[in-house]
Amino acid sequence: MAAGQGGWLRPALGLRLLLATAFQAVSALGAEFSSEACRELGFSSNLLCSSCDLLGQFNLLPLDPVCRGCCQEEAQFETKKLYAGAILEVCGUKLGRFPQVQAFVRSDKPKLFRGLQIKYVRGSDPVLKLLDDNGNIAEELSILKWNTDSVEEFLSEKLERI
């Protein structure tokens, strides 16, 4: 039985070594990743850098460079920067599962914010993408568990009201 387990673990160990090598190569570049790249690597769009500090507790230190490239400092959430626009993405067929987001989207409240677009994307959970002056995604946040007031308050801080 031990031989069978060893044979099963070898591919997993090889994959871990490959991932560790890739992560080390990325860390040597000191790269920051786009929100899409981070999502593909399995990191949340609202990952805080303080979470990366916990990787050592789980023997996941090889992931640290990528985690640092995908995380946001806590101080970034406290800035009063106004964004040029925002896109609230949600799947129309899933909207009923998120009644608070549904209430916001179907109300007149989105019309109060300059540059806010509601975009229906098949299969998407509710996500808020904040856009810079060039129309590029500057921040991306999951609003899965936000209530209507939280969405409105956050947008009031980040977008210009009409």
Swiss-Prot record:
Molecular function per GO: oxidoreductase activity; selenium binding; thioredoxin peroxidase activity
Entries under InterPro entries matching the protein: Sep15/SelM_sf, Sep15_SelM, Sep15_SelM_dom, Thioredoxin-like_sf
Annotated localization: Endoplasmic reticulum lumen
GO cellular component terms, A-Z: endoplasmic reticulum lumen
Signal peptide: 1-28
One Gene Ontology term from the biological process aspect of the record: sperm DNA condensation
UniProt keywords, alphabetically: Endoplasmic reticulum, Selenocysteine, Signal
UniProt superkingdom: Eukaryota
Main localisation: endoplasmic reticulum
A matching Pfam family: Sep15_SelM
Quaternary structure and partners: Forms a tight complex with UGGT1/UGCGL1. Interacts with UGGT2/UGCGL2. Interacts with RDH11.
Similarity section: Belongs to the selenoprotein M/F family.
Record's function text: May be involved in redox reactions associated with the formation of disulfide bonds. May contribute to the quality control of protein folding in the endoplasmic reticulum. May regulate protein folding by enhancing the catalytic activity of UGGT1/UGCGL1 and UGGT2/UGCGL2.
Protein name, as recorded: Selenoprotein F
Lineage of producing organism: Eukaryota, Metazoa, Chordata, Craniata, Vertebrata
Gene behind the chain: Selenof
